[in-house]
């Protein structure tokens, strides 16, 4: 099993200590009752990875690690083989001892769009909701975060995160927990909460915003990145069965409507910070994610539309404060 004991020890004397009233029992129940059918296979790959300590570690500009003595061809091939058993890799990229994990998403591009608009992360305790393999957690650490906690119920992502952590020297400044936001008590303990690429997957988006608010300290900052459509404060797209081939897309508001939603939930100082059309340079099929990607989800004759005829993916970043 993956050991969360170090995380429990880490939070025992800080503002997250009251989480220990519920968290260990939740994780124990997950380990007992809810493991994915392939979890043992993924965990076996994780166990067989060497625990490396990098001589050069860059989390500020990328997630990359190097050793003073290059790995042998055999070592590198073995590590790459083990990492490939954890495919598909969706969020990255990672560069680890000469192995470049070219993920489906260039998550570094999103980070470059978000970072200029937020309160500096130095010394902050951070929650990243729907964190995937944890790429952005490492970038948060690189930006000076004291502690970056990610939650994501997808167990493959947890194993990918732990694999990267093992190759980064067992760094304990970032952690991923196999939970959804709805499983968290109202901690009111995080300085910054990120929700990126999650809102449109929620059946009740306003409930999601309230849940995010419940995790923030007073004057804490929410960083919300999500799909939007063009339009005024009354514009919300409710797709049919699929949007860009995704079945679980429920509401896509305009940025103006989303600003209203945030204010309705009690957030203040709401700013629409960035718009970005998703391109096939940012989301694409790679050797580490071999199934369909954005190019397959767009109308082959009109890239401004999805295959279903909806507007192609447009993403916005909004920043807000909990009073």
From Swiss-Prot:
Biological-process GO terms, alphabetical: tRNA wobble uridine modification
Enzyme's top EC category: transferase
Keywords from the UniProt entry: Transferase, tRNA processing
Pfam families, per the entry: Methyltransf_9 (PF08003)
Entries under SUPFAM superfamilies matching the protein: S-adenosyl-L-methionine-dependent methyltransferases
Catalytic activity: carboxy-S-adenosyl-L-methionine + 5-hydroxyuridine(34) in tRNA = 5-carboxymethoxyuridine(34) in tRNA + S-adenosyl-L-homocysteine + H(+)
Any one GO MF annotation of this record: transferase activity, transferring alkyl or aryl (other than methyl) groups
Quaternary structure (record): Homotetramer.
Family to which the UniProt record says this protein belongs: Belongs to the class I-like SAM-binding methyltransferase superfamily. CmoB family.
Summary of the function given for this chain in its UniProt record: Catalyzes carboxymethyl transfer from carboxy-S-adenosyl-L-methionine (Cx-SAM) to 5-hydroxyuridine (ho5U) to form 5-carboxymethoxyuridine (cmo5U) at position 34 in tRNAs.
Name of the protein in its database record: tRNA U34 carboxymethyltransferase
Gene field: cmoB
């Amino acid at each position: 099993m993956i050991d969360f004991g170090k995380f429990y020890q880490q939070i025992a004397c800080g503002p997250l200590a009251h989480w220990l009233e519920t968290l260990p029992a939740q994780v124990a129940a997950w380990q007992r009752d809810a493991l994915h059918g392939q979890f043992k296979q993924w965990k076996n790959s994780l166990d067989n990875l060497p625990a490396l300590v990098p001589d050069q570690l860059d989390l500020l500009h990328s997630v990359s690690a190097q050793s003073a003595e290059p790995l042998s061809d055999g070592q590198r091939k073995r590590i790459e083989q083990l990492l490939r058993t954890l495919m598909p890799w969706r969020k990255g990229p990672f560069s680890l001892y000469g192995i470049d994990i070219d993920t489906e998403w260039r998550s570094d591009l999103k980070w470059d769009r978000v970072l200029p608009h937020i309160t500096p992360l130095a010394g902050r305790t951070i929650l990243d909701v729907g964190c995937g393999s944890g790429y952005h957690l490492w970038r948060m650490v690189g930006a000076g975060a004291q502690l970056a906690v990610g939650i994501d119920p997808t167990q493959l992502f947890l194993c990918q995160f732990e694999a990267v952590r093992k190759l980064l020297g067992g760094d304990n400044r970032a952690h991923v927990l196999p939970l959804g936001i709805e499983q968290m008590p109202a901690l009111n303990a995080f300085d910054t909460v990120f929700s990126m690429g999650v809102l449109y997957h929620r059946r009740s988006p306003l409930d999601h915003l309230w849940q995010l608010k419940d995790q923030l300290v007073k004057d804490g900052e929410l960083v919300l990145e999500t799909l939007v459509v063009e339009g005024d404060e009354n514009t919300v797209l409710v797709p049919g069965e699929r949007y860009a081939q995704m079945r679980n897309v429920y509401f896509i508001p305009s940025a103006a409507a989303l600003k209203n939603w945030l204010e309705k939930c009690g957030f203040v100082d709401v700013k629409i910070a960035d718009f970005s059309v998703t391109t096939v340079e940012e989301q694409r099929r790679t050797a580490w994610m071999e199934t369909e990607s954005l190019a397959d989800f767009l109308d082959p004759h009109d890239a401004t539309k999805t295959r279903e005829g909806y507007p192609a993916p447009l993403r916005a970043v909004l920043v807000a404060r909990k009073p």
